[in-house]
Protein backbone atom coordinates (compact mmCIF):
# COMPACT_ATOMS: atom_id res chain seq x y z
CA UNK A 1 0.00 0.00 0.00
CA UNK A 2 1.22 3.49 -0.90
CA UNK A 3 -0.31 6.92 -0.32
CA UNK A 4 -0.93 9.62 -2.92
CA UNK A 5 2.40 10.06 -4.79
CA UNK A 6 1.94 13.82 -4.60
CA UNK A 7 2.78 13.56 -0.89
CA UNK A 8 6.38 12.63 -1.72
CA UNK A 9 9.17 15.21 -2.43
CA UNK A 10 9.74 13.91 -5.95
CA UNK A 11 11.22 17.13 -7.36
CA UNK A 12 13.88 17.26 -4.66
CA UNK A 13 14.65 13.58 -5.10
CA UNK A 14 14.90 13.98 -8.87
CA UNK A 15 17.35 16.83 -8.35
CA UNK A 16 19.43 14.60 -6.10
CA UNK A 17 19.33 11.83 -8.72
CA UNK A 18 20.41 14.26 -11.45
CA UNK A 19 23.21 15.59 -9.27
CA UNK A 20 24.71 12.19 -8.48
CA UNK A 21 24.38 11.11 -12.12
CA UNK A 22 26.76 13.93 -13.05
CA UNK A 23 29.37 12.98 -10.48
CA UNK A 24 29.14 9.16 -10.47
CA UNK A 25 32.32 7.31 -11.41
CA UNK A 26 33.13 3.83 -12.63
CA UNK A 27 33.93 2.92 -9.02
CA UNK A 28 30.42 3.87 -7.84
CA UNK A 29 29.04 0.46 -8.78
CA UNK A 30 31.78 -1.37 -6.88
CA UNK A 31 31.46 0.89 -3.84
CA UNK A 32 27.73 0.21 -3.60
CA UNK A 33 27.80 -3.58 -3.76
CA UNK A 34 26.54 -5.44 -0.68
CA UNK A 35 26.31 -4.42 2.09
CA UNK A 36 25.56 -1.14 0.28
CA UNK A 37 26.73 2.47 0.25
CA UNK A 38 28.59 3.20 3.47
CA UNK A 39 27.26 6.77 3.78
CA UNK A 40 23.69 5.53 3.43
CA UNK A 41 24.29 2.85 6.06
CA UNK A 42 25.77 5.48 8.36
CA UNK A 43 22.73 7.71 7.84
CA UNK A 44 20.39 4.83 8.71
CA UNK A 45 22.46 4.01 11.80
CA UNK A 46 22.07 7.64 12.90
CA UNK A 47 18.29 7.30 12.55
CA UNK A 48 18.41 4.34 14.93
CA UNK A 49 20.57 6.34 17.35
CA UNK A 50 17.89 9.05 17.53
CA UNK A 51 15.73 6.44 19.28
CA UNK A 52 18.54 5.29 21.53
CA UNK A 53 19.20 2.11 19.52
CA UNK A 54 22.86 1.31 18.85
CA UNK A 55 23.28 -0.26 15.42
CA UNK A 56 26.64 -0.32 13.67
CA UNK A 57 26.63 0.54 9.94
CA UNK A 58 28.44 -2.78 9.48
CA UNK A 59 25.29 -4.60 10.69
CA UNK A 60 23.12 -2.94 8.02
CA UNK A 61 22.60 -4.40 4.55
CA UNK A 62 20.95 -2.20 1.91
CA UNK A 63 18.32 -4.05 -0.13
CA UNK A 64 15.94 -3.53 -3.05
CA UNK A 65 13.05 -2.53 -0.80
CA UNK A 66 11.91 -4.04 2.48
CA UNK A 67 10.50 -7.15 0.81
CA UNK A 68 13.97 -8.21 -0.30
CA UNK A 69 15.24 -7.54 3.23
CA UNK A 70 12.49 -9.76 4.64
CA UNK A 71 13.08 -12.52 2.10
CA UNK A 72 16.83 -12.53 2.68
CA UNK A 73 16.25 -12.58 6.44
CA UNK A 74 14.04 -15.64 6.08
CA UNK A 75 16.65 -17.41 3.97
CA UNK A 76 19.36 -16.59 6.51
CA UNK A 77 17.65 -18.30 9.45
CA UNK A 78 15.54 -21.10 7.90
CA UNK A 79 15.71 -24.13 5.62
CA UNK A 80 12.92 -25.46 3.36
CA UNK A 81 10.31 -27.25 5.46
CA UNK A 82 10.83 -25.13 8.59
CA UNK A 83 7.93 -23.57 10.50
CA UNK A 84 7.53 -19.78 10.55
CA UNK A 85 4.94 -17.97 12.67
CA UNK A 86 2.86 -15.19 11.13
CA UNK A 87 -0.02 -13.09 12.43
CA UNK A 88 -3.63 -13.89 11.54
CA UNK A 89 -4.42 -11.85 9.51
CA UNK A 90 -1.03 -10.85 8.12
CA UNK A 91 0.51 -9.05 5.16
CA UNK A 92 -0.20 -11.23 2.11
CA UNK A 93 3.40 -10.84 0.92
CA UNK A 94 4.57 -12.81 3.94
CA UNK A 95 2.54 -15.85 2.89
CA UNK A 96 3.80 -15.57 -0.68
CA UNK A 97 7.40 -15.41 0.53
CA UNK A 98 6.96 -18.47 2.74
CA UNK A 99 5.42 -20.44 -0.11
CA UNK A 100 8.21 -19.48 -2.50
CA UNK A 101 10.87 -20.57 0.01
CA UNK A 102 8.94 -23.79 0.78
CA UNK A 103 8.43 -22.84 4.42
CA UNK A 104 5.42 -23.77 6.55
CA UNK A 105 3.23 -20.92 7.81
CA UNK A 106 1.85 -21.18 11.34
CA UNK A 107 -0.71 -18.44 12.00
CA UNK A 108 -1.33 -17.11 15.51
CA UNK A 109 -4.46 -15.24 16.60
CA UNK A 110 -4.07 -11.47 16.47
CA UNK A 111 -6.35 -8.89 18.08
CA UNK A 112 -7.43 -5.71 16.31
CA UNK A 113 -6.26 -3.56 19.24
CA UNK A 114 -3.83 -5.64 21.28
CA UNK A 115 -1.96 -7.39 18.46
CA UNK A 116 -0.61 -10.93 18.58
CA UNK A 117 -1.87 -13.15 21.39
CA UNK A 118 1.27 -13.99 23.39
CA UNK A 119 -0.36 -16.94 25.14
CA UNK A 120 -1.31 -18.47 21.80
CA UNK A 121 2.19 -17.68 20.55
CA UNK A 122 3.79 -19.56 23.44
CA UNK A 123 1.54 -22.57 22.87
CA UNK A 124 2.63 -22.62 19.22
CA UNK A 125 6.29 -22.40 20.26
CA UNK A 126 5.80 -25.33 22.63
CA UNK A 127 4.07 -27.50 20.05
CA UNK A 128 6.06 -26.80 16.87
CA UNK A 129 9.81 -26.54 16.09
CA UNK A 130 9.49 -22.91 14.99
CA UNK A 131 12.58 -21.26 13.48
CA UNK A 132 11.34 -17.70 12.95
CA UNK A 133 8.48 -15.26 13.42
CA UNK A 134 7.59 -12.67 10.76
CA UNK A 135 5.69 -9.95 12.64
CA UNK A 136 4.76 -6.29 12.28
CA UNK A 137 4.93 -4.51 15.63
CA UNK A 138 4.10 -0.97 14.43
CA UNK A 139 1.13 0.02 12.22
CA UNK A 140 0.44 -3.59 11.30
CA UNK A 141 -0.86 -4.40 7.84
CA UNK A 142 -3.81 -4.93 7.60
CA UNK A 143 -5.23 -4.36 11.12
CA UNK A 144 -3.30 -1.17 11.88
CA UNK A 145 -2.42 -1.77 15.56
CA UNK A 146 0.88 -0.88 17.23
CA UNK A 147 2.09 -3.11 20.05
CA UNK A 148 2.68 -1.42 23.40
CA UNK A 149 6.29 -1.17 24.63
CA UNK A 150 5.45 -3.63 27.40
CA UNK A 151 4.18 -6.19 24.91
CA UNK A 152 7.24 -5.76 22.71
CA UNK A 153 9.45 -6.49 25.72
CA UNK A 154 7.48 -9.66 26.48
CA UNK A 155 7.52 -10.70 22.82
CA UNK A 156 11.30 -10.42 22.52
CA UNK A 157 11.83 -12.26 25.82
CA UNK A 158 9.47 -15.07 24.80
CA UNK A 159 11.11 -15.64 21.43
CA UNK A 160 14.55 -15.53 23.02
CA UNK A 161 13.43 -18.17 25.54
CA UNK A 162 12.60 -20.54 22.67
CA UNK A 163 15.59 -19.49 20.53
CA UNK A 164 13.33 -18.23 17.74
CA UNK A 165 14.41 -15.37 15.48
CA UNK A 166 12.09 -12.39 15.10
CA UNK A 167 11.97 -10.97 11.59
CA UNK A 168 10.47 -7.56 12.30
CA UNK A 169 8.69 -5.94 9.35
CA UNK A 170 8.73 -2.26 10.32
CA UNK A 171 8.02 -0.40 7.08
CA UNK A 172 5.31 1.86 8.53
CA UNK A 173 7.09 3.03 11.69
CA UNK A 174 7.59 6.60 10.42
CA UNK A 175 3.85 7.00 9.81
CA UNK A 176 2.79 7.64 13.41
CA UNK A 177 0.42 10.46 14.29
CA UNK A 178 1.36 10.93 17.94
CA UNK A 179 4.26 12.86 19.43
CA UNK A 180 6.86 10.12 19.51
CA UNK A 181 7.95 7.50 17.02
CA UNK A 182 7.18 4.03 18.43
CA UNK A 183 10.21 1.92 19.19
CA UNK A 184 10.68 -1.32 17.28
CA UNK A 185 10.99 -4.60 19.13
CA UNK A 186 14.64 -4.41 18.09
CA UNK A 187 15.12 -1.80 20.82
CA UNK A 188 14.84 -4.57 23.43
CA UNK A 189 16.98 -7.11 21.59
CA UNK A 190 19.89 -8.06 23.86
CA UNK A 191 20.75 -11.40 22.26
CA UNK A 192 20.94 -10.54 18.54
CA UNK A 193 17.65 -12.33 17.97
CA UNK A 194 15.82 -9.65 15.95
CA UNK A 195 16.34 -8.91 12.26
CA UNK A 196 14.86 -5.44 11.80
CA UNK A 197 13.65 -4.70 8.25
CA UNK A 198 12.45 -1.35 6.94
CA UNK A 199 12.61 0.92 3.90
CA UNK A 200 12.14 4.40 2.47
CA UNK A 201 9.36 3.17 0.16
CA UNK A 202 6.33 3.91 2.35
CA UNK A 203 7.46 7.28 3.67
CA UNK A 204 9.73 8.91 1.09
CA UNK A 205 10.07 7.39 -2.37
CA UNK A 206 8.36 4.15 -3.49
CA UNK A 207 10.03 4.05 -6.90
CA UNK A 208 13.61 3.98 -5.61
CA UNK A 209 13.05 0.57 -3.95
CA UNK A 210 15.61 1.13 -1.19
CA UNK A 211 15.24 -0.85 2.01
CA UNK A 212 17.53 -2.40 4.58
CA UNK A 213 17.91 -4.97 7.30
CA UNK A 214 19.71 -4.43 10.59
CA UNK A 215 21.00 -7.97 10.55
CA UNK A 216 23.46 -8.20 13.44
CA UNK A 217 25.36 -11.50 13.36
CA UNK A 218 23.52 -12.50 10.16
CA UNK A 219 24.84 -9.56 8.12
CA UNK A 220 27.59 -11.47 6.30
CA UNK A 221 25.29 -14.35 5.39
CA UNK A 222 22.65 -11.95 4.08
CA UNK A 223 25.29 -10.18 1.98
CA UNK A 224 26.26 -13.51 0.40
CA UNK A 225 22.62 -14.40 -0.24
CA UNK A 226 22.07 -11.03 -1.92
CA UNK A 227 25.14 -11.46 -4.12
CA UNK A 228 23.73 -14.81 -5.27
CA UNK A 229 20.29 -13.38 -6.10
CA UNK A 230 19.92 -9.71 -7.05
CA UNK A 231 23.69 -9.00 -6.82
CA UNK A 232 23.18 -5.49 -5.42
CA UNK A 233 20.80 -2.58 -4.93
CA UNK A 234 20.69 0.23 -7.51
CA UNK A 235 23.78 2.43 -7.11
CA UNK A 236 22.22 5.65 -8.48
CA UNK A 237 19.25 5.32 -6.12
CA UNK A 238 21.51 4.77 -3.11
CA UNK A 239 23.64 7.78 -4.04
CA UNK A 240 20.58 9.95 -4.62
CA UNK A 241 19.23 9.08 -1.18
CA UNK A 242 22.57 9.95 0.42
CA UNK A 243 22.45 13.33 -1.35
CA UNK A 244 18.83 13.98 -0.30
CA UNK A 245 19.39 12.97 3.33
CA UNK A 246 22.39 15.31 3.50
CA UNK A 247 20.07 18.30 2.88
CA UNK A 248 18.33 17.67 6.24
CA UNK A 249 14.90 17.96 4.60
CA UNK A 250 13.80 14.45 5.49
CA UNK A 251 12.35 15.17 8.93
CA UNK A 252 10.46 18.22 7.65
CA UNK A 253 9.00 16.04 4.90
CA UNK A 254 7.99 13.37 7.42
CA UNK A 255 6.18 15.93 9.59
CA UNK A 256 4.18 17.14 6.57
CA UNK A 257 3.47 13.59 5.43
CA UNK A 258 2.20 12.50 8.84
CA UNK A 259 -0.02 15.55 9.17
CA UNK A 260 -1.55 15.06 5.71
CA UNK A 261 -2.02 11.32 6.16
CA UNK A 262 -3.73 11.84 9.52
CA UNK A 263 -6.13 14.35 7.94
CA UNK A 264 -6.91 12.12 4.96
CA UNK A 265 -7.38 9.07 7.14
CA UNK A 266 -9.79 10.99 9.36
CA UNK A 267 -11.77 12.12 6.30
CA UNK A 268 -11.90 8.56 4.96
CA UNK A 269 -13.11 7.27 8.33
CA UNK A 270 -15.84 9.92 8.49
CA UNK A 271 -16.95 9.12 4.93
CA UNK A 272 -17.17 5.42 5.74
CA UNK A 273 -19.22 6.16 8.85
CA UNK A 274 -21.55 8.28 6.78
CA UNK A 275 -22.12 5.95 3.84
CA UNK A 276 -21.76 2.40 5.19
CA UNK A 277 -24.55 0.56 7.03
CA UNK A 278 -24.57 0.90 10.80
CA UNK A 279 -23.78 -2.80 11.28
CA UNK A 280 -20.34 -2.31 9.68
CA UNK A 281 -17.73 -1.72 12.38
CA UNK A 282 -14.84 0.55 11.38
CA UNK A 283 -11.64 0.33 13.39
CA UNK A 284 -9.63 3.57 13.46
CA UNK A 285 -6.05 3.87 14.73
CA UNK A 286 -3.50 6.64 15.06
CA UNK A 287 -0.86 5.55 12.54
CA UNK A 288 -0.33 4.17 9.06
CA UNK A 289 -2.69 3.89 6.09
CA UNK A 290 -5.11 1.24 7.26
CA UNK A 291 -8.73 1.14 8.38
CA UNK A 292 -10.15 -2.29 9.22
CA UNK A 293 -13.82 -3.00 8.52
CA UNK A 294 -15.91 -5.78 10.05
Residue ranges of model-derived segments:
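Hydrophobic/aromatic residues within well-ordered alpha-helical segments
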Residues: 9, 20, 36, 40, ...
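Conserved core of the PLP fold type I
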Residues: 17-162, 167, 173-192, 261
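Inter-domain helical "communication" segments and dimerization helices
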Residues: 22-27, 246-251, 272-281
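Conserved core segment of the aminotransferase class I/II
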Residues: 13, 190-259
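Conserved N-terminal helix/loop that builds the PLP phosphate-binding region
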Residues: 1-24
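Short histidine/acidic/glycine/proline-rich micro-motifs that form metal-
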Residues: 2-7, 111-112, 140-142, 172-175, ...
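Short beta-strand segments
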Residues: 86, 134-137, 167-170, 198, ...
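Conserved glycine-rich beta-strand-loop-beta hairpin in the small C-terminal domain of fold type I
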Residues: 259-269, 279-294
Amino acid sequence: AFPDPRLFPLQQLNRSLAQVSKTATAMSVIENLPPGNVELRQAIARRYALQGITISPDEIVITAGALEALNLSLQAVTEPGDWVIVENPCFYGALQALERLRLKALSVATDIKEGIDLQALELALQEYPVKACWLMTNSQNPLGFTLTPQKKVRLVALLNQYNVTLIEDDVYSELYFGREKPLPAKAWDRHDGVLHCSSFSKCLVPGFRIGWVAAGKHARKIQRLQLMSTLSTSSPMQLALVDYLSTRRYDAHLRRLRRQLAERKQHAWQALLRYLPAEVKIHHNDSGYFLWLE
